[in-house]
Amino acid sequence: MPNRASKSTRRAALSIALILASTAPAAMAQGYADAVALLTPLPLATTDAKAVDARCTDLLTGIGKARAALEARTGRATMAADFTAYDALQMTISDGGGEMYTVSQTNSDAAVRTAAETCYQKISDLSTQIGLSRPIYNRLSAIPTRGLDKASAFTLAKMLTTYRLAGVDKDDATRAQITQLQKEITETGVQFGANIRDDKGDMTLKPEELAGMPQDWLDAHKPAADGFVHLTYDYPDVVPVFEFASIRATRQKVLTGFSNRAWPKNQAVLKTLLEKRYALARLLGYTDYAQLVTADKMIGSPERAAGFLDDANVAAKPGAEADYAELLAFAKTVDPSIERLETWDNSYMKNLLRKQKYAVDAAEVRQYFTYDKARAGIFKLMGDLFGADIRPWDTPVWDKSVTAWELYDGQRLIGRFYLDMHPRAGKYNHAAQFPIRTGVEGQQIPVGALICNFPATGAMDHRDVETFLHEFGHLIH
């Protein structure tokens, strides 16, 4: 979930199932039973907003019952019973939210996406309330630390610190303000992302402005009836332009349009988000939001973070300056009018320099990669590296272009995943791994999805293949 308390809580809690499995497997199994039952349905392919609302009611009811049960616990507190119940509650929040977020970012029906976004916000709001629950905090605080192994003791301490950073020790009025601010931060963040997702763009270019583009790209981008080539902000439309368009003004036009997605709409949204984050930090006793979000991180403070970046800059600058000088000198041989390299020059000039210096032609490299070949190669790599056997998974999907797969270790099923890899209207327009179900040994198989935007047909840029492999690494992890 996007609010700070629950996100940090979930990260630290992910390891607890393995910790508890070695100490009290029976108690752990019972503790997760209700959560697993609630999360067993996987209605990602819904076409009905009312069905999303009904599913949301089930999730919120289940989360509410688990919360009430944990808050009402009495007697001796233990890791095996109480922390398992807490972790199961967090898993329900995380997985329920992941389910709704996936629907909100992938469904082709705007009403379904809106219903899922609304539910995601409701789950996030409930997560904030749980992150400020004094009864839960008091129950976790009552778990004896004596005799705990090192990992369990660390995890428990991390949870309690997260609660305190979230404001659990504040008075009722302050906690109510925190809850409201977290709600507004979530809503604003969702709106910011939705504005980018929904701005598909329509950049018009004359065919002659697209000199240098690979033939397979030109074949897929024919002029419309008005004589212009129309480009969206989808990666398969714009990224090859940055790399291959020989006319500098074309690269500038496309990169400027792409970089200004959701502007000016998001200008006010971002301002609101920054203001709300600052207000939250001040309410919690911090100087600013940067101080708040680094308080429980390894870096420790904004000052140390800035120092780390300064040190990295000092170390990297000589090499970067040498690379820039070489690329600028080369660029002037291509276009003598260039006095300095702009962002829209980098990919194009690097491609030309690699071609001259190393005989590596990016346009030729493209011809070796299509999506199907890249997918087959990555699946084979997983088999060669890990002995993984990836098989088709017969399950409903939310679009005809989506494929579903199961991951086996020998004959043992260890994971499931979806590949939603090509652009379409209303879909998330970047590349990411979406967690949908958390693995619980013996009870729940982990499920994830790759949501990307690669060309459905024709050639892929090598950088697309790198992105595919990068995101698939997250999925396997």
Please identify what each model-predicted range represents:
Residues 13-24:
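Bacterial N-terminal signal peptides
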Residues 2, 30-213, 230:
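N-terminal helix-rich structural modules
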Residues 25-29:
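Sec/Tat signal peptide C-region and signal peptidase I cleavage site
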Residues 2-14:
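Bacterial N-terminal signal peptides that target proteins for export
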Residues 463-477:
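Active-site recognition of the HExxH zinc-binding catalytic motif
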Residues 37-51, 99-119, 141-180, 231-267, ...:
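Short His/Asp/Glu-rich catalytic/ion-coordination signatures at enzyme active sites or charged loops
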Residues 155-156, 187, 194, 199-232, ...:
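Active-site-proximal, well-structured secondary-structure segments within enzyme catalytic domains
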